[in-house]
Regions:
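Secretory targeting and sorting signals
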Residues: 2-31
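Extracellular attachment/recognition segments
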Residues: 32-363
Length: 363
């Protein structure tokens, strides 16, 4: 006759522990993970002459790009007014842009391109450094790039807003912005940010605010100073998961900061936002120079034509750019510049997009 060990005996406790381990180990083996690494090859010098552009790229050898940015060296004299970001976008190969028919334009992009442009002035001090945020996750194994574009801005002191929206059943993990051509010296992207394709956010015209969850779209705003160009284009890019994941395990949180300035001519400003430990990994970020209140009203450009972006990049809490190989940075920084004229009422805006694959906000 066999005897079952009693619950309170050592043998009984051992059997209970063994049973719990049998249940727990498979669960742990299927834990959802997400980690990011910053890749940056360093600066590419230029543009060397007025009304030209320069491109550079960062590549993810062991993951997919979830976002990225750029940082520019501009010098310290009046020539600094001439250098501006022209684009920060995902790429299939580090050399090719997604610029054709809007919609889903690529899958599993692993490269990030950064573009710098010059106005009427150039300097040997100008350079552009790209930053790729490389995502490794056992939940988000594939991504897709959605592109949207619009003609403009084409007349002086105007802007053009365009929004790319993720397909239903996917999650937004990053985005980018681009304007062309570089030969129009005052044309540049002045905003790149996460948003929502819904009425509350005016279908992308109002940016996602601090603490908002699960944005599904990315907006780009092109701005122009005194120049004109009938062929000017503004592009927006959203980097989205594919629809084969269980969204109940995924949540994103937006962190946003807005600071006043730069207001006086030939000056710069920075703003930094970051993900808290409980919000998951920083997977991308955005930046803008604006007329303020971008999370409560439709985006409005700064009053003059000169304000522009000089950077949008992963960083530490003090705004220092993250170095090549940095694992799981927590902060994103926007670097803005007034250009050669005063710009009263300008604001610098920055967004950090935080991804949590352990807990979801959705029922």
């Amino acid at each position: 006759m066999s005897m079952k060990p009693r619950r309170g005996t050592a043998a009984g406790k051992a059997l209970i522990l063994a049973a719990l381990l049998t249940i727990a180990v498979p669960e742990a083996a299927h834990a959802k993970t997400a980690d990011v690494t910053v890749v940056s090859p360093g600066p590419t010098m230029g543009p060397p002459t007025p009304f030209t552009g320069v491109s550079s790229h960062a590549d993810c050898p062991d993951g997919l790009v979830s976002g990225g940015g750029a940082d520019q060296a501009i010098g310290s004299d009046e020539m600094s007014n001439g250098n501006h970001v022209m684009g920060m976008v995902p790429s299939a190969d580090g050399a090719t842009e997604y610029v054709d028919t809007p919609g889903v334009v690529g899958t599993d992009a692993a490269h990030w391109m950064a573009f710098g442009g010059s106005g009427s002035r150039s300097s040997d001090a100008f350079s552009t450094t790209p930053y790729a945020i490389c995502l490794s996750s056992n939940l988000i194994r594939h991504t897709q790039v959605v592109m949207n574009k619009a003609q403009g801005p084409s007349t002086g002191l105007s802007s053009k807003l365009v929004t790319a929206t993720c397909p239903t059943g996917t999650v937004l993990i990053g985005g980018g912005a681009r304007t062309t051509p570089a030969s129009v010296g005052s044309l540049k992207p002045i905003a790149s940010f996460p948003t929502f394709n819904d009425a509350d956010h005016h279908f992308g015209a109002i940016a996602a605010g601090d603490g908002e969850h699960d944005p599904d779209a990315w907006t780009a705003v092109g701005g122009i100073g005194g120049g004109r160009g009938a062929d000017n284009m503004t592009y927006a890019y959203a980097i989205c998961s594919t629809d084969d994941i269980d969204l109940k395990h995924v949540s994103t949180t937006v962190r946003f900061t807005e600071v006043s300035g730069p207001n006086t001519a030939s000056t710069g400003q920075t703003a930094t936002a970051g993900c808290t430990r409980g919000e998951g990994r920083l997977v991308s970020g955005g930046a803008a120079i604006s007329g303020g209140n971008v999370t409560t009203t439709d985006f409005g450009k700064a009053t003059s034509g000169g304000p522009h972006l000089n950077g949008s990049f992963p960083s530490d809490a003090a705004g220092t750019p993250a170095g090549d190989g940095t694992a799981n940075p927590s902060y994103w920084t926007a670097a803005t510049h007034s250009g050669g004229s005063p710009s009263q009422g300008s604001y610098s805006d920055v967004w950090a997009l935080c991804l949590d694959v352990r807990h979801g906000h959705k029922p």
